[in-house]
Amino acid sequence: MTAVRAARVVVVGAGVVGLLTALECALAGHRVTVLDRGTIPDPGSSSYDQHRAIRTLVPGDPEGTRRMVAAHRRWRELETVLGTAFYRRVGVVTAWPPDRVAAVVASAAEAGVEVTRLDPAGLPHLGFPAGATGVRETRAGVLLARRVLRAAARWLAAHPAVVLRPHCAVTAVDPRSGRVELAGGEVLSADLVLVAAGPWGRELVGRPVVLHRQTMLYLRPPDRLARWWRTAPAAGGLGADGRAWAVPPGGGTLLKISSDAVCREVAAADCADEDQAPWAERLALAGVLPDVGRYTVVAARACHYTTDAETGGAQLARLGPAVWARAACGGTGFASAPLVAGRIVDAVTEVAA
């Protein structure tokens, strides 16, 4: 067997994809430098949220389901690696029209994913579309996103083969040579570079992507519902139009609601001058929570993510012999991050062989 040498890896962007890729590369014996324009982790990054839902079933897509099962498994393993509990297995419920439920359940059975049907009346504090039926995936739940990023950054900071370089803006990446140019004129070289800078990396990548901005609301349930919410599942397909999500509080987080109905295409990730109030009001009235007036609104936040301009989904692209890019994360970028990290480790291994 040929020994694999320790390769030099540069990761541009310290969001969840960047940090997990750095971690996996270090575990594989490679030397890693992580660059970010802000702090590590950066509270302004797209990944830096209180929580994100994770589920494995992709109805009608056996390969997609298989991949998410693998991602779910790796997330559980990472709790041990990082020495931090960040996964709440509370389940994920999705609302479906009655005529689609049988196909969803059959798809789950074929993939070996455990699901149960439920009557929305059993979850009275979630706003299901009229006539919808719930399907609950039991081996699913919530990732405490902020806790993940902090734990990964601590682990990387303590690893002898990893260098974290916050406040290092990258101005150019050569896809053929792997040369990375920093704002101050410094140039780094690597055997492999991953650009995972989210919306702020579009100029470095040069791939056609669409930038989206979505307003999210963080709420505190009324005292009389606090106990109910402590064991509530994450839920999707909510609201009158079936386009909303609710992620339950727990582990120091608030209740979060979001909806595609308040997602819009934008030209830049800077939203300091945008008034979130109209979007937040529209979200509050979307029917995600039947008795929303009883909840206390703690904060509204705008989140940005990119999608492939052609497919509308995620995109992991090889830009050249030495450079890969997570050009678009799609709507499930956090949950699927271990898959990207694993693919990059495979690419580094090929380079180092």
Name each model-derived stretch.
Residues R8-V34:
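N-terminal Rossmann-like FAD-binding beta1-loop-alpha1 element of flavoenzymes
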Residues V10-V12, L35, V187-W200, A341:
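Short hydrophobic core segments
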Residues L23-L27, A85-Y87, P199-P321:
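Active-site substrate-recognition segment that forms the wall
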Residues L27-S47:
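Glycine-rich FAD pyrophosphate-binding loop
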Residues Q50-L126, G131, R243-A244:
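Dinucleotide-binding Rossmann-like beta1-alpha1 core, especially the glycine-rich loop
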Residues A95-P166, A172-D174, T307-A309:
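Flavin (FAD/FMN) cofactor-binding and adjacent substrate-gating region
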Residues T171-V187:
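Conserved beta-strand-loop-beta-strand element in the redox core of flavoprotein oxidoreductases
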Residues V323-A337:
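Glycine-rich phosphate/pyrophosphate-binding beta-alpha loops
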